[in-house]
Amino acid sequence: MNKTFKYIVLLALACFVGKANAQELKTEVFSLLNLDYPGLEKVKALHQEGKDADAAKALLDYYRARTNVKTPDINLKKVTIGKDEQKMADEALQHTFFAHKGYQPSFNYGEDIDWRYWPVKDNELRWQLHRHKWFTPMGKAYRVSGDEKYAVEWTKQYIDWIKKNPLVKVDKKEYEMTGDNQLKGDVENARFAWRPLEVSNRLQDQTSQFQLFLPSPSFTPEFLTEFLVNYHKHAIHILGIYSAQGNHLLFEAQRMIYAGAFFPEFKEAAAWRKSGIDIMNREINVQVYNDGGQFELDPHYHLAAINIFCKALNIADLYGFRNEFPQEYLDTIEKMIVFYANVSFPDYTNPCFSDAKLTNKKEMLKNYRNWSKMFPKNQFIKYLATDGKEGALPEYLSKGFLKSGFFVFRNSWGTDATQMVVKAGPKAFWHCQPDNGTFELWFNGKNLFPDSGSYVYAGEGEVMEQRNWHRQTCVHNTVTLNNKNLDQTESVTKLWQPEGNVQILVTENPSYKNLKHRRSVFFVDNSYFVIVDEMVGSQKGSINLHYQMPKGEIANSREDMTFVTQFEEGSNMKLQCFGPEGMTMKKEPGWCSTAYRKRYKRMNVSFNVKKDSEDAVRYITVICPIKNSADAPKLSAKFKNKTFNENGLEVEVKVNGKKQSLNYKL
């Protein structure tokens, strides 16, 4: 009797689990579709006769026969899969899900998938789980191998996700973790599973997954109705809860265009598409300054914004509604590309200011090739797209983007260039760090002053500590008061002179209450830099001038405040700081991050002065890029104007005895 009872319980449990994952015919799908859409005549007739199961079969037949709808993301005639994607697909069969590339090896989410499992309290890990990055590789694996196991598992996981992640009412601010951290149950889960950005991710990617798995026997009429009802719920959700601003809003709008274009059978499809187009046309004027800089002042998200705007155009070209984007929209994208090309280094990499990640040449060549198709007359873009084989470089070398606050000093466009990129712009948004005045410096094939980067975004405990460390003003190449973060980030350009033997940038930031920072940068004879920092105001405390050193052996001296890299011949530098009497130098361990959860150790340096009066604290730093450290020049520098002058500056610098007077008047 006991064994029989046990068997009945197990059988009931098996039936319950089977039913939980079973595909159900969702008849509400017919009320969501425009059954008068061309090709749906049979579906409409069967539905009106009350034969919804047959209508669902006819609907599946319609989608399998549909040829006029596709996306630019996948070519069904030439599906290929790489080694990494194959691994993602195979691991997903065992519920080991590739949620985030920063957390490898991937975590396993259990035989009975626990979509709420959060092994490391990093918000990105939990959010990005719900982007289902392994679904498209599973689809590719299915198409390449023909093995039904991928389709079977995909449909199971898709239904399982729907069942375990209900859309419940969540206050909008909760999606960005700015509200109540005590939320429980479905509400706590929904802030991750149904954040608009993740929803938009699924909206876009499921158009590819739909195409990849559509021929499978596992893609049943019942599953089709589940899929379409869920997809519709996604679009309606975003429509009512778009993010307020920034790159999230752009992603969501662009993906709503995808949804409306790929599933024109939905009654609201045209409204979805229009919603996305209207936002894109509006936000390109809101988020992009007239110099081409994106208002988050982060090279990574600037690049993302370019590609979002381009993706919207690509889908418009595919479906014939390019005329809904004005010429001004294209002109702005072109300016954004020119901006990005200018602030990038000769090897196609980018400064890692703010939350930027390091790109690579292969990735950027692909981008420039795509952009060159869109702007075939732009010779600069063509030059970069062809790695210099075609097109032409601009006639200028140094270039300033005054509204965005990015300034580039360069003496060449080649890899042998000396190039400094300075970031000193207006107040920006979440991804921007309080680092006004910072810079990166490239010389002859090497970045000698890489930014500290970001490492992680947000989360709990250690994750937030790591985030906050990389965001600090004091781990950038700029000046602080008592090593504290800047109170204000609203730099104003006082002078930009990008031509001649002495090129000059003068930028000023309010920084702290009663203490402003004026930074003057001189690029002398296309060979070395003189940076003058003046901290002006009644505020008292410790003034700290920070420099983040490159990785490797660096000889240094407290006596004369010098640092000379000891790298192999090709790219080295000497830095020497000249400050007030009593200035001290401090060396600390630092970090440099170029990708999410990847970083390496290096040395941070600060030159510290006690400010105990209203007199300005002033520094002169000379940075000489040199090929061989043995050739480090002898340096000296002094102020010619004895006190801070609101309207000008004059300093005298000697390099190996050669005197150079540097000055300006405002």
From Swiss-Prot:
Signal sequence range: 1-22
Protein keywords: Lyase, Periplasm, Signal
GO CC entries: periplasmic space
EC number: 4.2.2.8
Effect on the protein upon substituting C577A: Does not affect much catalytic activity
Catalytic residues identified in the record: Y301 (proton acceptor)
Tree of life domain: Bacteria
Subcellular location: Periplasm
InterPro entries found in the cross-reference section: Chondroitin_lyas, Hepar_II_III_C, Hepar_II_III_N, HepC
Record keyword Nucleotide-binding present: no
Class in the EC hierarchy, top level: lyase
Function of the protein: Specifically cleaves heparan sulfate-rich regions of acidic polysaccharides. Also able to degrade heparin and hyaluronic acid. Does not act on N,O-desulfated glucosamine or N-acetyl-O-sulfated glucosamine linkages. Functions in cleaving metazoan heparan sulfate and providing carbon, nitrogen and sulfate sources for microorganisms.
Protein name, UniProt field: Heparin-sulfate lyase
Organism of derivation: Bacteroides stercoris
Source taxonomy: Bacteria, Pseudomonadati, Bacteroidota, Bacteroidia, Bacteroidales
